[in-house]
Amino acid sequence: MDWHSFRIAALLLTSLVVLEVNSEFQIQVRDHNAKNGTIKWHSIRRQKREWIKFAAACREGEDNSKRNPIAKIHSDCAANQPVTYRISGVGIDQPPYGIFIINQKTGEINITSIVDREVTPFFIIYCRALNAQGQDLENPLELRVRVMDINDNPPVFSMTTFLGQIEENSNANTLVMKLNATDADEPNNLNSMIAFKIIRQEPSDSPMFIINRKTGEIRTMNNFLDREQYSQYSLVVRGSDRDGGADGMSAESECSITILDVNDNIPYLEQSSYDIEIEENALHSQLVQIRVIDLDEEFSDNWKAIIFFISGNEGNWFEIEMNERTNVGTLKVVKPLDYEAMKNLQLSIGVRNVAEFHQSIISQYRLTATMVTVTVLNVIEGSVFRPGSKTFVVDSRMEANHRVGEFVATDLDTGRASTNVRYEMGNNPENLLVVDSRTGIITLRNRVTMEQYQRLNGEYKGTVLSIDDSLQRTCTGTIVIELSGTGWVPGSDGGGSSSGSGGNRDPVTNGYQGTSTVGPQRVTGSGGVTSSGGGSGVNNTPGRQNPLDEPEPEPFDITEDNVHFGPAGIGLLIMGFLVLGLVPFLLICCDCGGAPGGGAGFEPVPECSDGAIHTWAIEGPQPEPHDGITTICVPQMPPGNANVIEYIDNSGVYTNEYCGREMQDLGGGERTTGFELMDGVKTSAAPEICQEYSGTLRRNSMRECRDGGLNMNFMESYFCQKAYAYADEDEGRPSNDCLLIYDIEGVGSPAGSVGCCSFIGEDLDESFLDTLGPKFKKLADISLGKEIDSYPDPDSSWPPQSTEPMCPQSTEPLGSGYPPISPHFGTTTVISENAYPSGPGVQHPLPIPDPLGYGNVTVRESYATSGTLKPSVHFHDNQQASNVVVTERVVGPVPGADLHGMLEIPDLRDGTNVIVTERVIAPGSSLPTSLTIPNPRETSNVVVTERVIQPTSGMIGNLSMTPELSSAQNVIVTERVVSGAGMSGIAGTAGLGGVGGIGSSGLVSTTMGAAGTGLNMGGTATIGHMRSSSDHHFSQTIGSASPNMARSRITKYSTVQYSK
């Protein structure tokens, strides 16, 4: 548009406005008077309208009082008369009340409160102008007040989660769902314009969906949806008003999209081929399991498979049954297979789904054949009649034994006539026919009579059985004979007496009742014979009656013995003989008791065995076997009257265990020889020689016992080892269980010794004594210091009666001299030797400080007087050796005894590790003249032993130690004080010799003598000593204490002082 035309248009518009405002129209209206028929003209003049100020718009959610007055009304009538203005409507006199008010004089309308556009989009105010009488001067005026919208409401989705679904492999841009969201702000306004956007997708591999930002429609982005990969997608969609502007409000919602399955996966079999084997003539309901793999949704028609035969099953031998729950097909055999006809079958099978394939893969589907190789296994089938029925013709001219025909069974394996079967007649009406058991030739038993012909009604039907004994199988063939011709000879029912159907003839029914047994089967019939082989019986012709005067035949049984001894019976018989042959072997191996000392046998369980000394003679668990003593060599006894004692002493047999004893009276008279097995210690069968002498004998190492006393060598070894163990253990622990004596005030009282009393409570705990049995009563009395009769009179009933068998004792007179001991019993000395090497593996004791210095040793001895000596007490080796009681008896000297003794010990360097063992021994008439202790092996551990024997007169004893042992580290001191009745004097000497030097051995010798009536005693002790270290433990066991030793008392001293 050019400028000239615009000027013309603006001029015309201005002229129109002026004309419209300033022009005045005058209209005349004719008024017809109907009464007089005149017409009157009225002149109507158009006047200028009164001016009204329009109402201003109000903004919601704000205070609009600053815009008051929002409107003003005015009537032209106010120029002539007073006018009152009033308003009404919503927000004034209708809810919500009081939003608008008016000035009745001026007509100004004001707003007084905040308004909400979503509640009231606009207000209509009805305005009126009234005069003084309340009459309307003007027509009511409608004044509209619009509420301006602000963006105060976010979008709202109609659902929290939108559900949708779509098929897999769908085309791109396929609609999936449409979202719906609303905004409460003013419609068709920017505040209510919503824009949609997908902000998140799960799984988030690649975006699959798009959304229309205006309409909210969700569509597929491509055609790659695959249910087998992801069956469900989750989207989060955001809706924002103001068309998605940054200043808009937003809301979010979820979308769940399910991918529907389609048949887009071709099924296939788990295996590419199958090989199966089946026996011929066998039917299988589950020959092989064929599993189908399909990736489509399970249990749907897209997943369910159908397996079908492509080729190879032309004879319909097989069927495939599908399991819809597992998608597994079962191949079944429904018709038997014949190995002779087909040895192998090649089946070709295919698979497809119940549902049709999807259009996306229908062009890709190709039928794939899976081969199933069936191997038919040959079995021994036996025989069968082919054909199963034969018909022959017999006329009246055929005599007995006439050949009717041949009915032979065919071997299914070879297709030829069977040669290993036998034939028998099954159902044989009138007993008419006979069959050869080998050839199967059928002949007439007798000539057919008229009566038989009439009963058979001109036709014979019977059965032939083919029996294979090796396979236990039977087949049946049917024989049909047509009786033709005339001239049947009359007869008295010949041959029918033994017929299978000629049993008890019923005159009422004109039938036959009887039983027939052929082979292993029994056939019972009524009015005919029915064979178990499948043959048919023929009843008599109805209406044909038998003569009433004919005698009734008795029931009959035709039985053929077919009993044979099978392989199972032979096997059971052989097994029975084997079991019977095994019984003597079991009786030999069964240990029902053994000879005494023979090893095997039942051992009696000792009573109250808790706390007993076990068979291995030490406390604690059973020790490992030592290589030191593996065998016991028992020397043969010398013949004649040789010195038995000397021979035994020099034999060099060392053992700590005994299993027998032999009692021998060497003074003349009788010899009592016995052999008693001691199972309690479990050693070899060497007897213990226990001697009781009435005279004076010389013996070096043989232990003495009275009436078969204790195994003293074993007891000494046991208690010595226990003493050493206690001493070693005591050296490694604090001295909280010893009486601490300090003679010098202020000396030897370390501050640390005060705290040892904290352990007294545990040491004084004697609650364990409540659980000890009666066997420990003697030990408890000893611990309490009670007076105990240590030497009771010998029991006249000893030895006790043993429940085990013993060798009989023999009594025979003795001549001069000593007879030899039977060599088969053997002899065993009682000398013990235990070697304990002091190597680096031995635990070293901690040294005990000597506060009094070296060489200051004092020994105090005290003696008490007593009456005459009491006999000694001996404890015999119990066979179980479970309870051992050791007693101690202290016997003092007689009044007037003068005891003298002297002990000289040079300075002992590191001589603090000293063990003093005291043994108190009571003498008897059976003491040997001398006691000899064998030299122990080289060791670094020594024992101090003190032996006191009751003196009767003066005793002089001295002990001297050579200066060479001044630097000895471990010293053994042995003192023996002996006495006897009527002694004139006692002299004892002790010598201690040693060689100074590293690794040398020291020697300690003590010799004690006693003179009395008929008693001479001498003793020597030789102990090896090694000065290798001062820290070695005491580990050497020293033999020879005393045969009557009752108890060993072990005391540990840090300093030993000796004085007279």
From Swiss-Prot:
Repeat positions for Desmoglein repeat: 835-861, 862-891, 892-921, 922-949, 950-978
Biased composition (Polar residues): 510-519
One GO CC term, this protein: nucleus
Main subcellular localisation: membrane
Domain of life from the UniProt record: Eukaryota
Tissue: Expressed in epidermis.
Keywords tagged on the record: Calcium, Cell adhesion, Cell junction, Cell membrane, Cleavage on pair of basic residues, Cytoplasm, Glycoprotein, Membrane, Metal-binding, Nucleus, Repeat, Signal, Transmembrane, Transmembrane helix
Subcellular location: Cell membrane; Cell junction, Desmosome; Cytoplasm; Nucleus
Location of region: Disordered: 490-560, 792-811
Topological type in the membrane: Single-pass type I membrane protein
Composition skew (Low complexity), residue ranges: 792-801
Gene Ontology molecular function terms on file: calcium ion binding
Residue ranges annotated as Extracellular topological domain: 50-567
Biased amino acid composition, Gly residues: 492-503, 525-537
Annotated ranges, domain Cadherin: 50-157, 158-269, 270-389, 386-493
Acidic residues: compositionally biased ranges: 549-560
Stretches in topological domain Cytoplasmic: 589-1060
PROSITE patterns: CADHERIN_1, CADHERIN_2
Residues spanning the membrane: 568-588
Keyword hit for Ribosomal protein: no
One GO term of the biological process aspect: homophilic cell adhesion via plasma membrane adhesion molecules
Function: Component of intercellular desmosome junctions. Involved in the interaction of plaque proteins and intermediate filaments mediating cell-cell adhesion.
Record remark: domains: Three calcium ions are usually bound at the interface of each cadherin domain and rigidify the connections, imparting a strong curvature to the full-length ectodomain.
Subunit structure, interactors included: Interacts with DSC3; there is evidence to suggest that the interaction promotes cell-cell adhesion of keratinocytes.
UniProt name for this protein: Desmoglein-1-beta
Organism annotation: Mus musculus (Mouse)
Encoding gene, per UniProt annotation: Dsg1b
